Structures are given as structure tokens and as C-alpha cells.
């Protein structure tokens, strides 16, 4: 009888623990990535068939919220070779670390990514930004160039592989 009683208590307790673990895992989603996820409306604006690049001069870092309800993001303003100011959207503030590129106003940059229209405004969603003014190239990578997968959605192992330096192009 005692053995049956222990099983009777253990099984419900185990179920409660499993439910609690699932709730904890679900709540561990980073709120700093809201709206920036792989299948999000924002990410659907990145059409790899429109892949392009341009050169210009870095002007400033800006805070962005591309679509209502998204977590805050980071962008930069680049003056292109025609003198036009381009908003380059990099990614969520919780992921993008601008200090890795060491950009200063006037630095020459090469930006790779896609042109798109968001809320009636033409913007450039970046996959890479290279600082061409610091001697050897320093770059900030935020998406896979092959398919536009955001780096903030990669596993730690995938991210480590992608962060390896590439030969200059």
C-alpha cells in the first residue's frame, strides 16, 4: 500500500514539474527580439533575390522600430556616393553591437543587403557592414548572405562559424 501511495504522489508531482519547465522555457524567449524573428512580418521584407550592395560614408547610429510592436532596433545612416542619405537597418538592439565595427562619422563603408519599402519609406536591410577606413577591413555581420537568415536566430555553434573572418571582396 505504501509503494502505491508514493507512485500516486510522484506521478502528479513529475507532471507539475514538467509543465513548470515548459512555462519557464517559453517565457525565456528574448523580449528584445519581438518582431525580429525568422518568420516575422519584418523578416519577410528581406528578399534575397533583391540582394545588392553600395558604398558610402557613415553618418550616425540611429534607434529604429521598423514596424509597430517590434522591439527596438539599431540602424545607421549612410551617405551614398550620390549624396543621398540611406537608412540601413541592422537588427534588434539586444543583438547588434556597434562597437565591434568602430564606426566614426565620415568613415568609408560598404553595405550589403536588400532594398525594401517599409511603411512607404525605402530602406536598406543589411546583411553586412564593412568599415573600409580602419586599415584592415572590420565588418559587422547580421544576416546570412545566402538566404537572409538573421544571425540572432542562429544557434551558438552556427553563429560562431558565421563570425569567422572572410577574405576581402
Specify the residue positions occupied by each region the protein language model found:
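Short boundary/loop segments of OB/S1/cold-shock single-stranded nucleic-acid-binding domains
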Residues: 30-53
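OB-fold/S1-family single-stranded nucleic acid-binding modules
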Residues: 116-148
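Bacterial N-terminal signal peptides
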Residues: 11-21
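Short nucleic-acid-contacting surface segments enriched for D/E, G, S/T with interspersed K/R
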Residues: 94-111
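Structural detector for short beta-strands of small beta-barrel domains
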Residues: 50-70
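Bacterial N-terminal signal peptides that target proteins for export
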Residues: 2-13
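Extended, charge-rich, solvent-exposed interface segments
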Residues: 135-169
